[in-house]
Curated annotation (Swiss-Prot):
Record note on quaternary structure: Monomer.
Source organism of the structure: Escherichia coli O45:K1 (strain S88 / ExPEC)
Annotated binding of (R)-lipoate, by residue: K134
Annotated PANTHER family: LIPOATE-PROTEIN LIGASE, LIPOYLTRANSFERASE 1, MITOCHONDRIAL
Name of protein: Lipoate-protein ligase A
Length: 338
């Protein structure tokens, strides 16, 4: 029986693909070598220990229907679209070795006519007239008896959109998370005009088979045709949840301030695991009572725009004569934390 397994996802859903990756990684026999090929529609993927409010322009993502997905490996934030090919190599220990998977990807690129080389710990670069340009970034995860190496190859990604989502708003955040380094990147289509996801997948597959000296049939998976993966529904539910994607952010503080016609407002939030642990409100408003009441209501609240709005608008019952001010405050606050 072959020790290789090849899976190709037909889904562009990042939460589905990361849930498949997680399930296979947890359940594969330690003797198996797995290659999983996939791609995501418009998504910002962040590292396991990152703060989405610090790394991403979450408001712009929401406006443009770009998803957020937290992966289980470390490293920085990346933007995925259908111009990216994603790969995951998995193996049991002691055989797991990221230099093997890196060489498989380099061999695949070489077979396609691209000479690339490893750079630093995580990147593959090509030489251009403007200097070295990154075409691939990777991240890794290891447990006691197994490991995986996953990464992306830039084929024809809309690089102009990176700055839209990976540069956060000028929010006054003092965060304990990890800040991503923005690398200089290029697409493989600059070197291989017309290169497709299917061609790249085939090249990686052939290099994978060549390295191990055996072949297997590909398993095509999609939300309508999932492999037999115990606990997949629970893993997908977690992967797609707000609690995992946002709530796992490291503790951070957020300062918001705005001047309205009726006075200036400064809000200080301390946030842990996606919940406000401390809220302070400062104002020169002639009627500070609603804002003082708001500070109390926000303690323990989920740090989510709709929840903040809900708590603010709940004060209309107690302060009906401040309706205009509270509605202005509610709309501003929701926009500021998106």
């Amino acid at each position: 029986m072959s020790t290789l397994r090849l899976l190709i996802s037909d889904s562009y859903d990042p939460w589905f693909n990361l849930a498949v990756e997680e399930c296979i990684f947890r359940q594969m026999p330690a003797t198996q070598r797995v290659l999983f090929l996939w791609r995501n529609a418009d998504t910002v993927v962040i590292g396991r220990a990152q703060n989405p409010w610090k790394e991403c322009n979450t408001r712009r993502m929401e406006e443009d229907n770009v998803r957020l997905a937290r992966r289980s490996s470390g490293g920085g934030a990346v933007f995925h679209d259908l111009g990216n090919t994603c790969f995951t190599f998995m193996a049991g220990k002691p055989e797991y070795d990221k230099t093997i998977s890196t060489s498989i990807v380099l061999n695949a690129l070489n077979a396609l006519g691209v000479s690339a080389e490893a750079s630093g710990r995580n990147d593959l670069v090509v030489k251009t007239a403007e200097g070295d340009r990154k075409v691939s970034g990777s991240a890794y995860r290891e447990t006691k008896d197994r490991g995986f190496h996953h990464g992306t190859l830039l084929l024809n990604s809309d690089l102009s959109r990176l700055a839209n989502y990976l540069n956060p708003d000028k929010k006054k955040l003092a965060a304990k998370g990890i800040t991503s380094v923005r690398s200089r990147v290029t697409n493989l289509t600059e070197l291989l005009p017309g290169i497709t996801h299917e061609q790249v997948c085939e090249a990686i597959t052939e290099a994978f088979f060549a390295h191990y000296g055996e072949r297997v049939e590909a398993e095509i998976i999609s939300p309508n045709k999932t492999p037999d993966l115990p606990n997949f529904a629970e893993t997908f539910a977690r992967q797609s949840s707000w609690e995992w994607n946002f709530g796992q952010a490291p503790a951070f503080s957020h300062l918001l301030d705005e001047r309205f016609t009726w006075g200036g407002v400064e809000l200080h939030f301390d946030v842990e695991k996606g919940h406000i642990t401390r809220a302070q409100v400062f104002t020169d408003s002639l009627n500070p009572a609603p804002l003082e009441a708001l500070a109390g209501r926000l303690q323990g609240c989920l740090y989510r725009a709709d929840m903040l709005q809900q708590e603010c608008e709940a004060l209309l019952v107690d302060f009906p004569e401040q309706e205009k001010e509270l509605r202005e405050l509610s709309a501003w606050m929701a926009g500021a934390v998106r």
